[in-house]
């Protein structure tokens, strides 16, 4: 028994709902704790590496690929997925449209990339231990799932509440999703406009350890 991959898009409405819920937990965690993720890879050497040499930039963002991003946008707006679909996607009722693993998932400028059934966190330097990054990732996603559970366990209509929870999470945290070129100078300006952090150095990052949400 190898368990269940919770980030594997499913073949049934139930499996799709599970996938979307856990996907949203990861999206929310990366957005809420982008500072802590940057801290887990902070070192003098990595400060020089990030943003060059096929390494992602210091700005934390998530790559989902165009197909999955369009599906999330359709859910957020309660609109058809594309011009060929007349029916609005309902979580727990409909299956997701088939989508291919995006060929650009090899884009090394993405710090946190979805590659079909898993995420890759690409900011860690080769000489650094993965223990701190894993601890922050697992703990932050667990915290988001705890918040989701508090909402869903009180739901009178589970499917309606689940749909609204996922829709609300997408709307509030879509700023962290970026499928473009992380090396492009325009991304720095766009990230600032979105309210994302650009912690270029270790001292800049470490200061956020004392943020109230992180203590």
What is the predicted function of each stretch?
Residues 29-215:
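Acidic, glycine-enriched catalytic cores built around paired aspartates
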Residues 2-43:
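Catalytic or ion-translocation cores adjacent to nucleophile or general acid/base/metal-coordination motifs
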